[in-house]
Amino acid sequence: VHRDGPDNLLSEFDIGYGDVDAAFDAAPHVFQESLWQHRGGGHSMECRGGIAEYDTASDQLTYWCSTQTPHAALRTLVDMLGRDESDTRVVTPDIGGGFGPKLVFYPEDVTLCIAAMFLGRPVKWIEDRREHFVATTQERDQYWEIEVACDEDGKLLGIRGEIVHDHGAYTGRGINLAANSAETLTMGYVVPTCRMNVKVALTNKIPTTPVRGAGHPQATFAMERLRLGPTLHPNITYKRSNRLPNNLGFQ
């Protein structure tokens, strides 16, 4: 995707606990499931937009925008423009929904401010719905290969597998989506051992960022699918932990 990179692998890491290989070696039953969790998005009633105004006399820059994170947007803006926070304001009025994609600081945000400073007059931009579908960040697009080990009674002994996360062409919020999916896989169940290998891949698609759960729903779907999948042991049982919120793997 990017010529200056050796490949399209943005990041690779393992998340887990316990002796997973020993659990699988000793398990009388091992079952496997392949999952693809396709892309989706947070399609708010109001698309992204902003108005930038620059006062040449006072060197005051004001940016009204539909961000969910005005303080983070301010820090990013002053860093990119080389300005002081005392001379820059980011104002967020009521916005028509956010759901995660409006956490991201987009190129349009800084472009509007640069245009206002260059022209010396207010500049306004509103994203239309077609632009939203091809320019605003999306979520999911994960490929899971996952195995579960259980004993003769269907009791879970361990889970292991691989997640390949389609990150899109650029990174908007780091690798938190893929990490969250792996970290929250075991959820409220007793799973003695777990290890997930996570690969974050760059592709020529729209970047993926948090949308309604930020990776957690993917983990929930995978865990419950393991329980209900047709390839699994008909007597497999999940034991809910009575130790929440502590001492339960990642929880």
Model region roles, listed by residue range:
Residues V1-Q251:
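Structural alpha/beta core scaffold segments of enzyme domains
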